[in-house]
C-alpha cells in the first residue's frame, strides 16, 4: 500500500545542509498499523509528512496505492491526497464552528451538497463517539474529544491511509488509551492503513503491528512489535523499550550482583518469554533437568497486542557444561536468552 524508496531529505541550515532523512526504505501493507518511533529530532515528523508530500523529499520515491506521488502533476497530487487523512498533536479546530461543522469542512471545500455532508458526517460522529456533542463548539469539549473531532475530520474524505503525527502526546494516559482504542477500531472496521508517529514505546506496544525505529534520519531497526521487544538490537531501541519494560537491573541491585559475581562464578541472564511460554513451567523444568540454581533478580509480565510477554533477569549457577546445555534447552523452548555477564 505504501512504499518509501531510497527516501532522503536535506534542508539548508546555518552550518550547511542538514540530513533530516537518509536513504529510507519502508513497505507498509494495506490494513496495517505501522509505528515510527524515535527520540526528538530523529526525523519522524519529516518522514510522515513525505508520505502525503507536505514535505517533498530531496531524493527518492513515495508510492501510495500504486501511484508514485513524487511524479504526479499538481492536480493529480491534490486528488491523491484526498485518500490520505492526517491528524496532529494540535487539534487545529476552528473555534467558530461546531463539532459537526469542523468535521464537515473538508467536504464543504470539495463542493459536497448538504445532503452528502449530512450522510457522511453523522456516521463519523457516531463512530468517534461524539453524536451528542455535534452542536457544541471546541471550547465546550475536552482535549480527548477535540482529538476525536480531528480524527472524524480526517476520515471525512474516506481516505485509505491515516497519518498520525504525535496525536496522543498532549493527552493524559487514560485519554491516550481511549484514542488508541479508537484508532484500532477504525483500523479493524474500515480496513484503514495507519502510520503512527510517536516517541512513546507504550503507544507502539498498545496499537501497532510493526514498528520502525528512527535515529538521526535513518531506520536503525524494523520488525514486528513483539520481535523488537523480544530482541532489540540497536541501542536506541533498547533505550526506548526501557521506558516500558526494564532492560537493566535497578542500580542498587546491579551493584549487589556485581559484588556477588566477583566472589564466585555465575551467569547473569535476561530471559524473554512470549505466548504460551509465559504460562509454562520452563524455568523449573530447566532447574530440575540440569541441576542449576536460578536466582530471580528482576521480572515483569506485560502484554503486547494481546500477546503475553515476560522478561526475567536471573543469576544462574551450576557446572559450566550444564549451564551451556541449559541455555541451549531454553532456546529450544522459544525463550530468548541474553547473557549479560559471566564471571569465573
From Swiss-Prot:
InterPro entries: AAA+_ATPase (IPR003593), ABC_transporter-like_ATP-bd (IPR003439), ABC_transporter-like_CS (IPR017871), ACT-like_dom_sf (IPR045865), MetN_ABC (IPR041701), MetN_ABC_transporter-like (IPR050086), NIL_domain (IPR018449), P-loop_NTPase (IPR027417)
Residue intervals of the ABC transporter domain: 2-241
SMART domains noted in UniProt: AAA, NIL
Keyword Cell membrane in annotation: yes
GO molecular function: ABC-type D-methionine transporter activity; ATP binding; ATP hydrolysis activity
This protein's record includes keyword Ligase: no
Any coiled-coil regions, as ranges: none
EC number(s) on file: 7.4.2.11
Swiss-Prot/TrEMBL catalytic activity: L-methionine(out) + ATP + H2O = L-methionine(in) + ADP + phosphate + H(+); D-methionine(out) + ATP + H2O = D-methionine(in) + ADP + phosphate + H(+)
Keyword annotations: Amino-acid transport, ATP-binding, Cell inner membrane, Cell membrane, Membrane, Nucleotide-binding, Translocase, Transport
Family matches, as SUPFAM superfamilies: ACT-like, P-loop containing nucleoside triphosphate hydrolases
Membrane topology: Peripheral membrane protein
Residues given in the record as ATP binding sites: 38-45
Pfam short name (any one): ABC_tran
Gene3D superfamilies on file: 3.30.70.260, P-loop containing nucleotide triphosphate hydrolases
A cellular-component GO term for this protein: plasma membrane
Cellular localization per UniProt: Cell inner membrane
Primary role: Part of the ABC transporter complex MetNIQ involved in methionine import. Responsible for energy coupling to the transport system.
Subunit structure: The complex is composed of two ATP-binding proteins (MetN), two transmembrane proteins (MetI) and a solute-binding protein (MetQ).
Family membership: Belongs to the ABC transporter superfamily. Methionine importer (TC 3.A.1.24) family.
PANTHER family on file: AMINO ACID IMPORT ATP-BINDING PROTEIN, METHIONINE IMPORT ATP-BINDING PROTEIN METN
Name of the protein in its database record: Methionine import ATP-binding protein MetN 1
Species: Burkholderia lata (strain ATCC 17760 / DSM 23089 / LMG 22485 / NCIMB 9086 / R18194 / 383)
Source organism phylogeny: Bacteria, Pseudomonadati, Pseudomonadota, Betaproteobacteria, Burkholderiales
Amino acid at each position: 500500500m505504501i512504499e518509501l524508496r531510497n527516501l532522503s531529505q536535506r534542508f539548508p541550515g546555518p552550518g550547511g545542509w542538514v540530513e533530516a532523512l537518509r536513504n529510507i526504505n519502508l513497505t507498509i501493507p494495506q490494513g496495517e498499523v505501522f509505528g515510527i518511533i524515535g527520540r526528538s529530532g530523529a526525523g519522524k515528523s519529516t518522514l510522515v509528512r513525505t508520505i502525503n508530500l507536505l514535505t517533498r523529499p530531496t531524493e527518492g520515491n513515495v508510492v501510495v496505492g500504486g501511484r508514485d506521488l513524487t511524479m504526479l502533476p499538481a492536480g493529480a497530487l491534490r486528488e491523491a491526497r484526498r485518500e490520505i487523512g492526517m491528524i496532529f498533536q494540535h487539534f487545529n479546530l476552528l473555534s467558530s464552528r461546531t463539532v459537526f461543522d469542523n468535521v464537515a469542512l473538508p467536504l464543504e471545500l470539495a463542493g459536497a451538497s448538504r445532503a452528502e455532508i449530512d450522510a457522511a458526517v453523522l456516521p463519523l460522529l457516531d463512530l468517534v463517539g461524539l453524536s451528542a456533542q455535534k452542536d457544541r463548539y471546541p471550547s465546550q469539549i475536552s482535549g480527548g474529544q477535540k482529538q476525536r473531532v480531528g480524527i472524524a475530520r480526517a476520515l471525512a474524505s474516506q481516505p485509505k491511509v491515516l497519518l498520525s503525527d504525535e496525536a496522543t502526546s498532549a493527552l493524559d494516559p487514560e485519554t491516550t488509551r481511549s484514542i488508541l482504542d479508537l484508532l484500532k477500531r477504525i483500523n479493524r472496521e474500515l480496513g484503514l492503513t495507519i502510520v503512527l508517529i510517536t516517541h512513546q514505546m507504550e503507544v507502539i506496544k498498545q496499537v501497532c503491528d510493526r514498528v520502525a525505529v528512527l535515529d538521526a534520519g535513518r531506520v536503525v531497526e524494523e520488525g514486528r512489535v513483539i520481535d523488537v521487544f523480544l530482541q532489540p538490537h540497536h541501542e536506541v531501541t533498547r533505550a526506548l523499550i526501557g521506558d516500558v519494560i526494564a532492560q537493566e537491573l535497578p542500580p542498587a541491585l546491579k551493584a549487589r550482583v556485581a559484588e556477588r559475581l566477583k566472589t564466585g562464578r555465575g551467569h547473569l541472564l535476561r530471559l524473554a518469554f512470549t505466548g504460551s511460554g509465559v504460562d509454562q513451567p520452563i524455568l523449573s523444568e530447566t532447574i530440575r533437568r540440569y541441576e542449576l540454581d536460578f536466582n530471580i533478580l528482576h521480572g515483569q509480565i506485560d502484554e503486547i497486542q494481546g500477546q503475553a510477554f515476560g522478561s526475567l533477569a536471573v543469576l544462574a549457577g551450576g557446572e559450566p557444561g550444564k549451564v551451556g546445555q541449559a541455555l541451549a534447552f531454553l532456546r529450544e523452548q522459544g525463550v530468548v536468552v541474553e547473557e549479560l555477564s559471566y564471571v569465573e
